[in-house]
């Protein structure tokens, strides 16, 4: 039952109800209709995020604060299709355990990327495509920046 699609929410509100219920396996949610995932897991107490790495994010435009203050979140999201993504401000801010930086994301359409990560992050650990797309405000707060290929 792990990879069986059971739920197909039509909007963010329906998706939020599903993700707030820890008895619902994230593998079982088809997110292909969702355009807005902003604050979806903000301050979430959920401990099991298995299956989120397989979500269909091809229509998502907004992931603002999606994992902000989600202290247990730490999944590899490199498989996500981010080609339509425009907003990622505060996306991983204060997600204290998160360290699987998405280095394969398409960020060509990003318009807003304020404080995506915590202020004390070691920017040298970020992939080059994320370094280039972060706003000056993020860079100004970080120390010892060394951008290399």
Report each predicted region and the residues it spans.
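Negatively charged
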Residues: 1-149
């Amino acid at each position: 039952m792990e990879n069986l699609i059971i739920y197909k929410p039509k909007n963010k509100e329906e998706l939020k109800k599903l993700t707030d219920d820890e008895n619902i396996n994230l593998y079982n949610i088809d997110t292909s209709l969702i355009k807005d995932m902003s604050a979806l897991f903000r301050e979430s107490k959920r401990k099991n995020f298995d299956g989120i790495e397989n979500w269909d994010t091809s229509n998502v435009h907004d992931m603002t604060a999606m994992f902000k203050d989600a202290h247990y979140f730490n999944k590899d999201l490199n498989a996500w299709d981010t080609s339509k993504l425009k907003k990622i401000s505060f996306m991983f801010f204060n997600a204290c355990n998160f360290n699987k930086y998405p280095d394969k994301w398409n960020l060509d359409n990003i318009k807003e990327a304020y404080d995506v990560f915590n202020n004390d992050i070691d920017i040298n650990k970020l992939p080059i495509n994320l370094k280039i797309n972060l706003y000056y405000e993020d860079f100004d707060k970080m120390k010892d920046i060394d951008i290399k290929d």
